Every structure is written in C-alpha cells, then in structure tokens.
Amino acid sequence: MPVNLEYLGFKLPGNVDEKYVQFKLKYRKQYHETEDEIRFNIFKSNILKAQLYQVFVRGSAIYGVTPYSDLTTDEFARTHLTASWVVPSSRSNTPTSLGKEVNNIPKNFDWREKGAVTEVKNQGMCGSCWAFSTTGNVESQWFRKTGKLLSLSEQQLVDCDGLDDGCNGGLPSNAYESIIKMGGLMLEDNYPYDAKNEKCHLKTDGVAVYINSSVNLTQDETELAAWLYHNSTISVGMNALLLQFYQHGISHPWWIFCSKYLLDHAVLLVGYGVSEKNEPFWIVKNSWGVEWGENGYFRMYRGDGSCGINTVATSAMIY
C-alpha cells in the first residue's frame, strides 16, 4: 500500500495549481479534461515524492518538477527505462590493474571539451536507453580513432539488433555484438530515430563506422576514471529511480532509495571531477533531451557505487 506522504509531514505548496499550469506550459503538455485531472493528481503525488528524496538523500542534488512529473513510477519505468539488467557472469577481459596510469590522471576531465561527444538526444516514450548509451560510446571511440565526430543511428539498433528488444529494453553488451554482426552503424541522418519498433532498414553500403570488439570494465571507480581518461567514454547501467525528479547537482542517494542491484537504465560516462565541497562525481550523458537535468546531463557521486553506476561498465573497441 502506498504511503501517504502528507501524514509524514510533507506538504503541497499553496500554489500547486499554478505550478501545474506552469509545468504544462513549459513542457507543452496537453490533456483532455478527464486525463488532466488524473495527471494533476499524479503531479501532486510526485511533488511530495520529490520532497521525500530531497530530505533523505545525501549530496547536493536538487529534486523537484521535471518533464516527467506527470508520470507514475510504473509509467516512467515502462517508457524511459529498460528491463532489469543481468550483471555479466564472466569478466575475463576486465583489466584488473592500470598500474601507474591510475595515479597519472587530472583531477577533472571531460570528453565534451575534447569534441568527442555528440549533442544530447531524446529517446522519447521508448525504452531504448541502451541504444543511446551504445551509440554514444561508439561515437566517442570513433572520434578518438579518426578525429571525426559522427552522430550514429539508434533506430538501427532498435530495429535490427536481434539480441535486444527495441523499445522494450536491451543491453549495450548485446548491442556491440550486433553491431559487429551487422558490419557497423549507419549515420543518424541516414537512419533517423522514430522512437518505436519498426522493420529493419539497414543498408550495408550505408554503414559509416565499425567496431572490432567490446570490453567489460572494472567496477573499481578509480580505475574506471583512469580508463575513461586514457581511452574514451564508458557505457554504464544504473538504477534510475531518482532521476525522474532530478533537476541539478550531484546525486548521492542512500542505497535504500537506489539499490545497486536493480539496474534499469543505460547512460554514458563522459567525464569526472571533484566539486568545491570535495565531492567526487561522474559527468553523465542521459538520453532524455536537453530540458531534463543539467542540459541533458547529470552528475553522480563517484567512489561508492551509487545507484550501481559502476556495476556494468562496458565499451566498444576500435583498432
């Protein structure tokens, strides 16, 4: 039975009606009268839920109204997350030690500043985060090899990756294997995103990039940061429960709010840093558009496996 948060002392703001109107205008939401009443009730419930997160989480993150404040937890999970991930049983190709390289990295680093990261994209109402995390990684790896930043097709993976399930979820580790079998990825412009499962329209003569293999990376976040610095961006899985209401700051939830064993979202590590308050963090690219979070990005505490962000880290390899 859901907990009534108002009984716990959380209160709706007096201008909640006005906030709802502003929310609909800002995010261009339109509902019929009956649907509007349902969404307003969900909106109010989510405001209280965001207050709960704000009080009982660590870190400097601010939680509140976002583009997804009109969705229930189940609706949000079904349309923006993916099925629960299974941690790979074999990590035989995991680099166990980077030696001196671990201590030879800067305090702050961001692949965006190197021109290695494409613009933030939007998966829409489709559980294809795994495809965006994968293409983001391949885009950066291709840039590192050739110096060319190309925007690659997520829709190709949604439609043609036989190891995954399109808008119903998937895994970057499977996607890498499928990319190799398909011979590579087409450009976004030549196979544009449509946010739904469709028939495969892959044209092998239209493939723009290739990969040779993939690698499962260490769960040690110090070594992950070193790998990112010396190599490229990293595809990771995480528990994204709190991200529904994330606005900005460094997210650092207690494990009870964000179990590392319940991974349901794929994102892309593009950098790392340390805040003025000495909080180590990851810079993470999401696939929910630029109106969410910090212009489509968020920062997650680095060092204690918050939300399982270090649990399943992978990358394509291009020789």
UniProtKB/Swiss-Prot annotation:
Protein keywords: Disulfide bond, Glycoprotein, Hydrolase, Lysosome, Protease, Signal, Thiol protease, Zymogen
EC id: 3.4.22.15
Disulfide bridges in this chain: 126-167, 160-200, 258-307
InterPro entries linked: Papain-like_cys_pep_sf, Pept_asp_AS, Pept_cys_AS, Pept_his_AS, Peptidase_C1A, Peptidase_C1A_C, Peptidase_C1A_papain-like, Prot_inhib_I29
Presence of keyword Transport: no
A Pfam entry, by short name: Inhibitor_I29
Entry keyword Plastid: no
GO molecular function (one): cysteine-type endopeptidase activity
Assigned protein family: Belongs to the peptidase C1 family.
Function: May be crucial for metabolism of host hemoglobin.
Protein name: Cathepsin L
Originating species: Schistosoma mansoni (Blood fluke)
Organism lineage: Eukaryota, Metazoa, Spiralia, Lophotrochozoa, Platyhelminthes
